[in-house]
């Protein structure tokens, strides 16, 4: 090699990694590289040939090569040419410095709160404060009635708490900011309402696929289309059965008081991180606006850093947030993993409130604000000697069927009360069907368009049912 | 040696089997590979490998995470800048790179592209413009040239399909970005410029200075149906006249971006949400009476009558007194003028139904409200209305207790007509004995603790309302 004019490293090529694009050929001013004439038996293309007698080591050929393992500068490795084994790259390149240490999981910390006088809060504010208590310092959203109070309070609180509120260009952008922040392992959330939730579904599907946590608070309003801004429950189908494309599910929580807006938002973050999956809070328009008594929990959370986070430091460097699995068997395996997770959620996380159900013959099934009207109706019915009870699912997906089944032997009639054309009833019927149970007769009180079922009409239905028994 | 920023073995590329363990998925001669190398070198040379988060798009670069040994996130089509923003805000120390093609960045993700650029947070956007859709198989891109034949412009792109979008110029005219350059790869000189531009863009982010955007005119030999050499010539001769190369914007900006660190300070949190710690042994208040099973009230008036404030004061006073209470306003456009009404429930136990379709008590501030809601009042309920404003009574349900108090007149007498809602609350207390009077004044003082100057007027209005239905000679 004594004829080389300088000591600069020369290009080196492993022929198996040349795709013969020839970009290097015209990059070389000294015409050192020529198109190959011999087919490589592994790749089936003819790799370029290097004739380095006139090479100046300018490296322009290397800069022209699109392949990371294509043309490289030979820093003492030319002796390996021709001896390279595909199976053993470490033999060729040496064992690379291993930067990846076991990623430490910084655990969440619970910081005690003193006992406080109860707060008097709107549901939307209670939810925002629940998120702050959960350690959420990243809120992304787009204004939409009737959810804006949540975003407005967060716009005020976040800067004070070293957090961020971003009013995104759209719900589409907002959900993808959640994908980014959630992928970095920090608790992130949004407040939205039905049309905005529709726009977020693409991102929710990606979050579920990539196992990114995040909390969506959807104050459901009247639809379809622009509908109106009055309360409805017509996103139950969307949240339970239609979270974007593919095999998607997420815990769906249905609060019915301002206190539950706080408690369930707080719980939603923990569940979201426990299962690395989004959690959907379905409120109705009424609930966001309703003011009531709200008591603070005993602790405030300082979230840790999960091992899987794509954080941007050495210990998390090997992590990947992605929902793409190109090989069919890989994607099938991924979906089986998701299915096991859904099954674990269904087994462990269902919640329901049973109000006067013990000896109930007429079971009213309702959630959100209509459940409160139903509760009032049950109370009045009991005062009149009618054996009514309220079964209130708090998780809509998974439906708390295990809490319902023991009540069925005594139940002579189920009345589903909802501000939607049967979406809750569909969930109930599907859950009964999966449980292989033939239910008692099911009737319903359904209102829509922003009209909520009223206590009087629920009561009338209970009374009519009882008369029919007699 | 290849860049240490590339993995030694492309484990994620078909599990690293065979050739795929060391070859990219890109076609021969593709510009992506060159930009990958430039980017990897820049990350390595600036010492950023342990801080970098690379966002891969949907498009041919969807598998960038096969190659780059950095933190990786793969975004939905067009949303990479939003994902990048989420990462940057979660960890401002991270070096976040959004790597996107022309369909991703300039078509489906245009809203995210523009809004993120205008926001100007320090992230780096690498835009590969090869004037065609690669991954989906050669369709028309927003940057395809007029006359360019693609599978979705088989006769050549014409005016009716829109002209090619010059994104670098679009981004440069926004206020957010500090550095915008368009570079190319078609000859060694251009490739050197491209390397420098990419490195500079990253350095500006590492220094916290701002948003940088590098548009790279790249070759797609496969879908241009040209050899790599001819594809280079095509970029040079056909693309460059439409997409002029060069620096479009280069501002000198001092580092400005700060966010966090997140605070979990208990006292700060309590102050922000208005929570007041109790003395350790404080017993929760107990309702003075259990006679209130579940009382429902409706406050109704015109926007500006203060019906909501009155309803909220009552709700708070009841909760402070140990009751459960709820308030639901009418809301939406209605709350911005027109009628405004509020439902309140008070219960010694739990408020079951928070709506008040058949209120026990109606407080009406104007005639339309009285006409609308009086027929709904529960049998033997109470109707309290502004007797100065409502002179023509509608038909009222039999059996109701009906009380007229001139809320507005009394408030005007105190010099502030807007205090009429406090007069109404006073009258409500006087007429029904609902909560002891001092419960209202305690709550009022609490609510106005930051605005003590408003307290005397409100207290006076409350007292005047009470006296109007409950003369001082009669014990309360």
Question: What spans do the regions from the language model cover?
Answer:
Chain A
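Thiamine diphosphate
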Residues: 79-81, 93-242, 249, 456-460
């Amino acid at each position: 090699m004594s004829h080389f004019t300088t000591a600069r490293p020369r290009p080196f090529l492993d022929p198996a990694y040349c795709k013969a694009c020839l970009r290097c050929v015209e990059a070389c001013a000294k015409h050192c590289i020529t198109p190959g004439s011999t087919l490589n038996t592994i790749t089936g293309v003819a790799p370029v040939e290097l004739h380095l007698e006139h090479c100046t080591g300018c490296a322009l050929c290397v800069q022209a090569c699109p392949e990371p393992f294509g043309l490289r500068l030979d820093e003492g490795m030319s002796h390996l040419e021709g001896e390279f084994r595909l199976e053993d790259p470490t033999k060729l390149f040496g064992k690379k410095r291993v930067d990846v240490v076991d990623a430490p999981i910084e655990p969440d910390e619970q910081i005690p709160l003193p006992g406080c006088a109860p707060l008097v809060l709107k549901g939307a504010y209670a939810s925002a404060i629940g998120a702050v208590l959960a350690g959420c310092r990243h809120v992304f959203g787009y204004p939409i009635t009737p959810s804006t109070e949540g975003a407005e309070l967060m716009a005020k609180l976040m800067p004070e708490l070293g957090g961020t509120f971003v009013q995104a260009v759209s719900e589409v952008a907002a959900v993808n900011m959640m994908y980014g922040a959630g992928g970095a392992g920090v608790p992130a959330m949004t407040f939205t309402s039905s049309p905005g939730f529709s726009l977020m579904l693409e991102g929710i599907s990606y979050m579920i696929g990539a196992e990114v946590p995040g909390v969506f608070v959807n104050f459901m309003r009247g639809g379809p289309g622009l509908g109106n801004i009055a309360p409805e429950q017509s996103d139950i189908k969307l949240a339970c059965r239609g979270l974007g494309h593919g095999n998607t599910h997420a815990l769906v929580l249905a609060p019915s008081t301002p206190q539950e807006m706080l408690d369930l938002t707080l719980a939603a973050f923990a569940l979201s991180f426990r299962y690395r999956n989004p959690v959907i809070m379905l409120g109705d328009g009424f609930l966001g606006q309703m003011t009531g008594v709200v008591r603070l929990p005993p602790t405030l959370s300082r979230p840790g850093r999960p091992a899987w986070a794509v954080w941007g430091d050495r210990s998390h460097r090997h992590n990947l947030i992605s929902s793409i699995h190109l090989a069919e068997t890989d994607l099938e395996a991924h979906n089986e993993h998701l299915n096991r997770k859904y099954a674990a959620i269904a087994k462990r996380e269902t919640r329901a409130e049973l109000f006067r159900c013990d000896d109930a013959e007429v079971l009213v099934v309702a959630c959100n604000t209509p459940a409160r009207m139903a509760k009032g109706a049950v109370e009045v019915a009991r005062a009149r000697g009618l054996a009514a009870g309220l079964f209130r699912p708090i998780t809509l997906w998974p439906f708390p069927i295990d809490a319902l089944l023991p009540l069925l032997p005594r139940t002579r009639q189920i009345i589903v009360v909802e501000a939607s054309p049967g979406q809750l009833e569909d969930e109930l019927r599907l859950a009964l069907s999966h449980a292989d149970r033939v239910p008692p007769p099911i009737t319903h009180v359904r209102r829509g368009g922003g009209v909520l079922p009223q206590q009087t009409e629920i009561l009338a239905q209970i009374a009519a049912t009882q008369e029919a028994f007699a | 040696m290849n860049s240490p920023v590339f993995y030694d073995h492309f484990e994620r590329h078909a599990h690293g089997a065979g050739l795929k363990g060391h070859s990219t998925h890109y076609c021969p001669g593709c510009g992506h590979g060159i930009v990958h190398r430039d980017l990897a070198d820049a990350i390595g040379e600036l010492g950023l490998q342990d801080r970098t988060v690379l966002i891969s798009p949907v498009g041919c670069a969807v598998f960038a995470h096969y190659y780059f040994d950095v933190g990786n996130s793969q975004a939905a089509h067009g949303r990479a800048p939003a994902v990048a923003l989420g990462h940057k805000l979660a960890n401002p120390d991270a070096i976040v790179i959004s790597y996107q093609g022309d369909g991703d960045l300039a078509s489906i993700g245009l809203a995210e592209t523009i809004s993120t650029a205008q926001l100007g947070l320090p992230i780096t956007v690498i835009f590969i413009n090869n004037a065609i859709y690669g991954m989906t198989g050669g369709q028309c891109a927003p940057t395809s040239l007029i006359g360019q034949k693609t599978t979705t412009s088989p006769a050549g792109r014409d005016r009716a399909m829109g002209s090619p979008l010059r994104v670098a110029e679009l981004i440069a005219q926004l206020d957010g970005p500090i550095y915008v350059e368009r570079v190319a790869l078609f000859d060694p000189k251009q490739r050197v410029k491209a390397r420098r531009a990419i490195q500079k863009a990253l350095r500006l982010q590492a220094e916290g200075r701002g948003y940088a955007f590098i548009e790279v005119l790249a070759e797609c030999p496969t879908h241009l149906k040209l050899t790599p050499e001819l594809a280079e010539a095509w970029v040079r001769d056909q693309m460059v006249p439409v997409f002029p190369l060069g620096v479009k914007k280069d501002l000198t900006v001092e580092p400005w971006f700060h966010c966090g660190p997140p605070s979990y300070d208990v006292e700060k949190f309590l102050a922000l949400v208005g929570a007041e710690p109790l003395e350790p042994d404080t017993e929760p208040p107990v309702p003075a009476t259990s006679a209130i099973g579940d009382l429902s009230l409706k406050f109704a008036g015109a926007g500006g009558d203060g019906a909501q404030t009155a309803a909220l004061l009552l709700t708070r006073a009841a909760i402070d007194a140990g009751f459960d209470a709820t308030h639901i306003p009418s809301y939406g456009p209605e709350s911005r003028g027109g009628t405004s009404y509020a439902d309140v429930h008070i219960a010694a136990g739990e408020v079951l139904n928070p709506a008040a379709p058949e209120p026990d008590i109606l407080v009406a501030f104007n005639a339309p409200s009285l006409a609308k809601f009086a027929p709904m009042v529960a049998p033997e309920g109470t109707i309290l209305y502004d007797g100065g404003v409502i002179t023509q009574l509608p038909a009222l349900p039999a059996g109701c207790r009906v009380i007229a108090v001139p809320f507005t007149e009394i408030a005007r007498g105190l010099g502030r007509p807007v205090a009429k809602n406090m007069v109404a609350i006073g009258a409500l207390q006087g007429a029904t004995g609902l909560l002891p009077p001092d419960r209202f004044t305690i709550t009022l003082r609490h609510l106005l603790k930051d605005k003590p100057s408003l307290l005397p007027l409100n207290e006076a209005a409350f007292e005047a309302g009470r006296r109007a239905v409950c003369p001082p000679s009669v014990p309360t």
